[in-house]
Amino acid sequence: MTDENRSIVKQGLSFLNQSCPIQIKALLNQAGYNNTINEETVGFIIGPRLNAVGRLEDASLAAELLMTEDEEEAEFLAEQVEHFNVERKEIVAQITDEALAIAEEKVNNGNQFLLLAKENWHEGVLGIVASKIVETYALPTLILNIDLEQNHAKGSARSIEQVSMFEILSAHQDLISKFGGHHMAAGMTMEIDYIEALEQGLNDWMFKLSEHTSLEPTKHVSVKLEENDISINNIRDIQRLSPFGTDFEKPLLEIDDNEVVDVR
């Protein structure tokens, strides 16, 4: 969220709030959302619903919704999109439960890179599942669906700040049919016969890295506050800095020596 991207997002959010298109309004109606549209609305409400269609089937329904100019049709199509989103959540929950069970065993065995593979996992949601595993264990994770008929495994990987997923997969590309990605994420296809060797290689790589690099999760505190720093004016000043996103994260504030009385 830097440079011209930041300017484009800010103008886009302003437009959505001043004159929200019927297509987006229909999506938000289905989600039961009627507040100010900000970057989190786009990232966690609008985006996932549009993506859900393409993840599970063909994205043409989402495209049809975005192109319609009829309000009644927009509501009808948005309702269908919402059904896909509900189904996507159910599939993610099921696969995540299965993946967490496998991950727990591997973590207990000392694995520092989690390669989780199983048949009949929907490939369209494996990136989401991988992110949830990373959130739980703070370890780089690769989730693969095994296709016995095609004799290959296909899936998505998510990483942690200290580990470049692109670098670690590049170091083992002789075991991978094809892959692409960046520091924090990747997608890949490989032959089933190489899964065990890849898992061993990735963990060996991680063990060498851990000899000189801490893999502990880190938090970067933006500023430490005193109690008298907490005011409506300061909160509004922080909000004026939005939109937040990659490379311009929402500030993390630290307050020491305070007792938590209530959580809502």
Where are each of the predicted segments found?
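A contiguous loop/helix-start segment that scaffolds small-molecule binding in enzyme catalytic cores
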Residues: 13, 21, 204-264
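Conserved strand-to-helix beginnings and helix N-cap segments that scaffold or border functional pockets
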Residues: 59, 126-128, 199, 232-235
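Short amphipathic alpha-helices in soluble, non-transmembrane regions
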Residues: 169-173, 199-206
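Hydrophobic helix-and-loop "lid/oligomerization" segment in the mid-to-C-terminal part
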Residues: 1-193
